[in-house]
Amino acid sequence: EARWLRGEPQGLLDGVPVTIKENIATQGDPTPLGTAAVPLVPAAADAPPAARLREAGAVMVAKTTMPDYGMLSSGLSSFHPLSRNPWDVSKGPGGSSAGGGAAAAAGYGPLHIGTDIGGSLRLPASWCGIFSLKPSLGRIPIDPPYTGRAAGPMTRCVADAALMMQVLSRPDARDSMALPWQDIAWGDFDQ
């Protein structure tokens, strides 16, 4: 708060709560990939999306659930209880970014990040009534790189997703498939 009072916020997201899908490493936290089958070893470093969010001052409030290895279009996991759609708990939130979709729809905060190979951002968006974006492969650097997997924002409005893209699309040398830096006017996409 003192930084804001001085007019010196840490970055675009200083103090803004954010959730991150559990397959994106955050330093000191395990990365269970939605399954009870992997050992819970704390991550040594933040993956690029988590690093960019921290650098911008975001406050990470939770890791969000996903199905085992992200291989279902539901919130069913051997590690977590079943994720539910907050609009109708008899239904699922879609997946594999199930927890992020449910968290965004329930208003757990304004900013959430998930990943997508075959609909994992887009299904929760349509099933939970939120906005998400699966950017082009490499637009948001990710580590470890995986062909076809993209990280992307999950929000309740386009303007918040555009704000996240300004932060998440910054370069990171750990992703060999990252696209070259482009100065995209993400803020123009909320018009």
Walk through the language-model features, giving the residues of each:
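Gly/Ser-rich catalytic/binding loops embedded in alpha/beta enzyme cores
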Residues: E1-I117
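Residues on a specific face of well-ordered alpha-helices
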Residues: A51, A98, A106-G107, L111, ...
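Flexible domain-boundary/linker segments
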Residues: D14, G70, S120, M177-Q182
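Short, hinge-like loop/turn segments at secondary-structure boundaries
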Residues: S78-P81, C128-S132
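A short helix-breaking turn/cap at a secondary-structure junction
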Residues: I130, K134-Q191
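Structural signature of FAD isoalloxazine-binding scaffolds in flavoprotein oxidoreductases
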Residues: R122-W127
